[in-house]
UniProtKB/Swiss-Prot annotation:
Pfam families: PGI. Belongs to the GPI family. GO terms for cellular component: cytosol. It comes from Spinacia oleracea (Spinach). Homodimer. This is Glucose-6-phosphate isomerase, cytosolic. The active site is at E360 (proton donor), H391, K516. The lineage of its organism: Eukaryota, Viridiplantae, Streptophyta, Embryophyta, Tracheophyta. Its main location: cytoplasm. The keyword Flavoprotein does not apply.
Length: 566
């Protein structure tokens, strides 16, 4: 396929478009009655079981999707990523987050150099530093151990590490390693977030990790300056060097900020923010909380999926299957949204993280060559742990819009609870819903079935479920650090597969720039209005009116800002 050719112009794409009419004649009630079909749509790898039999798909559908993958040169693109080629073409960068969790003896080249030794140099530095903090050999300026960590970052510097932290908090081995310690994440520039994160913390026992590649991210640096003031006002300016460290590549600005450059932990241009949880961005705060050995298990889990993604045939490749099925639902069946439904409270921050990974990666309107797409790429991701979501938005999923669902279940609970006299354990009660919901969506309930139950005729339309609503189920054996790493990598690569087939660049994010540049203009106006009383000007009528109202309501804010902390 020539570089300028869009995937929608290929025979494979057109064959799938034609195939849609055939699929719309089917119903999952009938498709699910074919045991051979269902068996062929189950894939196991390293303890994980994927069941995609409840997708609106037949053997022919899958064959055509694999042909589409071939037409898009999916295997070649996967190899290009692992080989360090500059597949992020708009920024002329490699995409090598797989190197972040590679084994020490692996060889992964970027710009003609094996990057794995550099990765492990940083990992070893994190191991040593986190052990010093956790053992108490590195103490704060007053001699007290640093038992509290506040990680300051935003976007990928926050959502990924928070997901992993939340997933590990209730895992027995990780929880034991974290006893007596706290890890918090400060992301929002809203001062309320600052107040919440320092509430109850003692500066004497707190270490702040500032995460910013360039050390210029506006929100992160304002929050960092706020916490620097919180520390220095309590302990003196010299305390900053003992109580603040950085994850950054801009050592000049790190030192200017007051942090010893020796306490800066590097990452690289080939690591995108939303793919950075396995870099120092996530590994440092997580190692401070749980110890490096726990985090290393997480990295090994991710690495196992990396190797599977790179080497498994498409028909047995978990991320490839998930990516192709998402693309089938979005681009052919017309379902733009996806619900991520983990039946595990420890995964409550998983959907928000994948929301960023997916929507920032694939929310693009042009091809990698800059050609406007005649189809919509990307999907709208949202989710909530089960069973909470059942009492929130499942009504729409069952009887409103068709939204493909990912059900994620854990065989062994992190916190098993049994009550004498109960029919099942608490976890079995949870998993009863995990198994029931996909079938409810697939089969639905017909008017005939309701009439046999003697339902009042006027209620029959309201209690009818059309069914034929697609989902897939992913069952993990447990939720250890290793399994968390597996889950992360599956979804990272799933997103890449979609982008590779759509022919877009999943590794840039120019869409976040325009709003930031406009915010700079607003910031200047607010400053001028506060200090000089200048009227709001240079904006459209609506913005001018609302900004003037805002300034009026906050006229008590002093022109020269004194220091005021929560």
């Amino acid at each position: 396929m020539a570089p300028s050719t869009l995937i929608c112009d290929t025979d494979s794409w057109q064959n799938l478009k034609t195939h849609v009419a055939e699929i719309k004649k089917t119903h999952l009630r009938d498709l699910m009655s074919d045991a051979d079909r269902c068996k062929s749509m189950m894939v196991e790898f390293d303890g994980l079981l994927l069941d995609y039999s409840r997708q609106n798909a037949t053997h022919d559908t899958m064959s055509k999707l694999f042909q589409l993958a071939e037409a898009s040169h999916l295997k070649d693109k996967i190899n290009q990523m692992f080989n360090g080629e500059h597949i992020n073409s708009t920024e002329n960068r490699s995409v090598l987050h797989v190197a972040l969790r590679a084994s020490r003896d692996a060889v992964i080249n970027g710009d003609g150099k094996n990057v794995v030794p550099d990765v492990w140099q940083v990992l070893d530095k994190i191991r040593d530093f986190s052990e010093k903090i956790r053992s108490g050999s590195w103490v704060g300026v007053t001699g007290k151990p640093l038992t509290n960590v506040v990680a300051v970052g935003i976007g990928g510097s926050f959502l990924g590490p928070l997901f992993v932290h939340t997933a590990l908090q209730t895992e027995s081995e990780a929880a034991e390693c974290a006893k007596g310690r706290q890890l918090r994440f400060l992301a929002n520039v809203d001062p309320i977030d600052v107040a919440k994160n320092i509430s109850g913390l003692n500066p004497e026992t707190t270490l702040v990790v500032v995460v910013s590649k360039t050390f210029t991210t506006a929100e992160t640096m304002l929050n960092a300056r706020t916490l620097r003031e919180w520390i220095s006002s309590a302990l003196g300016p010299a305390a900053v060097a003992k109580h603040m460290v950085a994850v950054s590549t801009n050592l000049t600005l790190v030192e200017k900020f007051g942090i010893d450059p020796k306490n800066a932990f590097a990452f690289w241009d080939w690591v995108g923010g939303r793919y950075s949880v396995c870099s120092a961005v996530g590994v440092l705060p997580l190692s401070l909380q749980y110890g490096f050995p726990i985090v290393e298990k997480f990295l090994k889990g991710a690495s196992s999926i990396d190797q599977h993604f790179h080497s498994a045939p498409l028909e047995k490749n978990l991320p490839v299957l998930l990516g192709l099925l998402s693309l089938w639902n979005v681009s052919f069946l017309g379902h733009p949204a996806r619900a991520i439904l983990p039946y595990c409270q420890a995964l409550e921050k998983f959907a928000p993280h994948i929301q960023q990974v997916s929507m920032e990666s694939n929310g693009k309107g042009v091809s990698i060559d800059g050609v406007v797409l005649p189809f919509e790429a990307g999907e709208i991701d949202f989710g909530e742990p089960g069973t909470n979501g059942q009492h929130s938005f499942y009504q729409l999923i069952h009887q409103g819009r068709v939204i493909p669902c990912d059900f994620i279940g854990i065989a062994k609970s992190q916190q098993p609870v049994y009550l004498k006299g109960e029919v099942v354990s608490n976890h079995d009660e949870l998993m009863s819903n995990f198994f029931a919901q996909p079938d409810a969506l697939a089969y639905g309930k017909t008017q005939e079935e309701l009439q046999k139950e003697n339902i009042s005729p006027h209620l029959v339309p309201h209690k009818t479920f059309t069914g034929n609503r697609p989902s897939l189920s992913l069952l993990l054996p447990s939720l250890t650090a290793y399994n968390v790493g597996q889950l992360l990598a599956i979804y990272e690569h799933r997103v890449a597969v979609e982008g590779f087939v759509w022919g877009i660049n999943s590794f840039d994010q120019w869409g976040v720039e325009l709003g930031k540049s406009l915010a700079n203009q607003v910031r200047k106006q607010l400053h001028a209005s506060r200090t000089n009383g200048e009227a709001v000007k240079g904006f459209n009528f609506s913005t001018t009116t609302v900004m003037a109202k805002y300034l009026q309501e906050t006229s008590d804010v002093p022109a020269e800002l004194p220091t005021k902390l929560p």
